[in-house]
Amino acid sequence: MNLRRSWRQLLQTLCLGLTAAALPLAAHAQANYPDRPVRIIVPFTAGGSSDIQGRLLAEHLGKLYGQSVVVENRPGAGGHIGGKFVADSGPDGYTLLLGSIGLHATYGVYKNLNYQPARDLKLITIVAEMPHVVVANPALEANTLAELTALAKAKPETLHFGSAGVGSSVHMVGELYKMAAQAPIVHIPYRGSSAATNDLLGGQIQLLFENVPTTIGYIQAKKLKALAITGATRSPALPDVPTAAEAGLPGLTVTSWTTLAASKDVPDALIEKISADLRRVYADPAFREGLERLGMTPVGNNPADARAFVERERARWNQVIETEHITAG
């Protein structure tokens, strides 16, 4: 018994010693972060709103760090291919995720996910909020939101709207329109916003409820027509486009948002360090103006506030999922 107790004491001492030795190493690694390139995983195709934000963030964060910050697109499954990749990326914090409503708030549409975003990802900040814009192919026989609703009711299930995938913000805002207007339109999911936008331009679909950054160039070039903005106020980027409330549909007042997140295995101290670094990026007028030019409102809050915000949004969007019986299988 004494021998067994001695071995147990020896093992406990060794474990404590190893833990104590590891603490200074971990603290040193965090203090020197980053000492090599950082990746921002954008879980959607290039050219969409998330990709645009990711590249702007990478540019300014790279300047701050004096290290390369690169964007890597990993699309699929409504963003969850990229989300799972980051969740499994380990504790070093060198692989970050540009997240979205679909990743953090509406993942309940996927019944067989092999990870749980709320459990397996740690939020660092809300990057930005932005309204959506209801855009149509110029050939559509509707120039206002009221005309769109009348057309949808007159020709039920003949109008099709695209999205970046089931559960994406572009999809969910379309579903919110269906609820608010009682408009029988049909959802067509795509692998990303770029593919959906291309089909809208080509006339294969008639509508998108897309983020402003993805569509503003086409609207300004008159290749697409904007019917309404979903924000509470008009967008400075599209000042002539009325809000949904002004157009008679206040139930479509909504914004989407993006996040920066990391694996749950990243220590809280490193999460807080990255958050503090981001606040320095947000203090740069050039970064804020870059977001604002694209119709986005910069946020840059701390991890605790980001978590509270996402929890409120998850509850809100779950109501839409349940009411519309939305599922991706």
Give the residues covered by each predicted segment.
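Beta->alpha turn/N-cap motifs
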Residues: 98-103, 163, 193, 210-215, ...
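Twin-arginine (Tat) signal peptide motif
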Residues: 1-14, 21-25
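A ligand-binding cleft/hinge motif common to bilobed small-molecule-binding domains
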Residues: 102-112, 176-180, 207-241, 318
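N-terminal (or domain-start) structured segment
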Residues: 29-120, 158, 182-209, 298-300, ...
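An extracytoplasmic/periplasmic, membrane-proximal ligand-sensing/linker region
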Residues: 35-37, 179-180, 220, 268-329
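Hinge/capping helix and adjacent helix->loop/strand transition within the periplasmic-binding protein
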Residues: 88-94, 108-195, 244, 257-290
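C-terminal lobe and pocket-closing loops
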Residues: 129, 215-283, 312-315
